Amino acid sequence: MVAGKPALSLDAKTLAAMPHEEVTVSAHDEAASQWRGVKLEDVLARAGVSLDKPLRGRALASFVRVTAADQYQVVFGLADLDPTLGHTQVLLVDSRDGKALDKDGPVRLLVPGDKRPARWVRNVTAIEVVDGGTTARP
């Protein structure tokens, strides 16, 4: 959901049709697995949040909140995802070792470069872009 824009709903078929990347990483004490998924920045672009130009001004304070079915949430600053700034690789994966995700899916968020998988989100149900550029203080 992007403020001021209609919500974008992606079903498994639509996600499967988008360009995928592969990474080999492990979570916790598990053996490394091959994961396939769509870059979060591609999903954001489809929702009208383009990162193809460097972020400036208020946009630097905006963030992406990812929520799981159990209400677990993680946040990424748009600047973290911007290719000219943090360029953090974040994937919405739909397969592991060549098989569709079962209990962790249908979509799971992975951050392959993180030293521990605390920002990996199972059963993603929502991705929101929040304008953090307000000058109002609580």
For each predicted feature, which ranges?
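N-terminal intrinsically disordered, low-complexity segments enriched in P/E/S/T
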Residues: 1-138
